[in-house]
Amino acid sequence: MDKPVVWARVMKVLGRTGSQGQCTQVKVEFLGEQNRQIIRNVKGPVREGDILTLLESEREARRLR
């Protein structure tokens, strides 16, 4: 359970998701030595340039239709 937390920068806000639009789907880029981008669902206010703390860095969200 002692996985290190990973920081990621929001590169682009893709849209709202969830049954009532309560989540925002964003594309994030990992900070540090990893040069990867994934799509995540974020709850709460978020905009481009924000830094997120990801407790789980392997899980990727499904794309919006």
UniProtKB/Swiss-Prot annotation:
Keywords of this protein's UniProt record, alphabetized?
Ribonucleoprotein, Ribosomal protein
List the CDD domains hit by this protein, alphabetically: S1_S28E
Tell me if Nucleotide-binding is a UniProt keyword of this record: no
What the record says about family reads: Belongs to the eukaryotic ribosomal protein eS28 family.
Gene that codes for this? RpS28b
Which domain of life does this protein belong to?
Eukaryota
SUPFAM superfamilies noted in UniProt: Nucleic acid-binding proteins (SSF50249)
Give the GO terms filed under biological process for this record. cytoplasmic translation; maturation of SSU-rRNA; ribosomal small subunit assembly
Give the matching PROSITE patterns: RIBOSOMAL_S28E
This protein is called Small ribosomal subunit protein eS28
The Swiss-Prot or TrEMBL record annotates one GO molecular function as:
structural constituent of ribosome
Q: Record keywords: Ribonucleoprotein included?
A: yes
| GO cellular component term, pick one | cytosolic small ribosomal subunit
| PANTHER family given in the database record | 40S RIBOSOMAL PROTEIN S28 (PTHR10769), SMALL RIBOSOMAL SUBUNIT PROTEIN ES28 (PTHR10769:SF3)
Q: Which organism is it from?
A: Drosophila melanogaster
